[in-house]
Amino acid sequence: VRAGLDHPDAVQFLGILDVLPTLDTWDVLRGVDAKVAWHLYLMAQPVGLPEKMIRAVGPEFFGSFLDAWETDASTFPLEVRRHYIDSSVNAVDSIVADYRATASIDLDMDRDDREVGKQLTMPVGVISQDWGSQLGFDAASLWRAWAPDLTYEPIQAGHFMAEEKPAEIARFIRDLSARARP
């Protein structure tokens, strides 16, 4: 999203899988509903403790997301699961830094952009689970505030939708790329 806002002439189309705009994420995840994104709050903390905590139980930490966010246990065969977890454990610092940025510099930049009415000018496609029905928000409306040229499509899949529904995701990306700006 940031690349599309900062470099609109270089981004011909933007495809988003199962996330909300950063500013809206923090606005809608409040109270008990925030438990679905507890990891965001952990990784938003100052440098040091989150990294140590995650490293202490790295395989269990990353494995818990595979277990909770997939809707089909066959999505990640054992070898793929092991590779995903090992790669994530080896990238703890960068993963945490990326998440930490969503609660600091990314958030500040999004607030500034919203204040001046900056939007994504390219075609934007968002495909996601229907979190709004569970958590009480309209994801398409949240995205439309940032992207007037929006295609929004809910999908019956877990967070790892590209792995669970590859044909549907490929079709979505093909359709979106056909709308790319020249």
What does each model-found stretch correspond to?
Residues 2-156, 162, 174-181:
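Flexible "cap/lid" subdomain of the alpha/beta-hydrolase fold that forms the substrate-access gate
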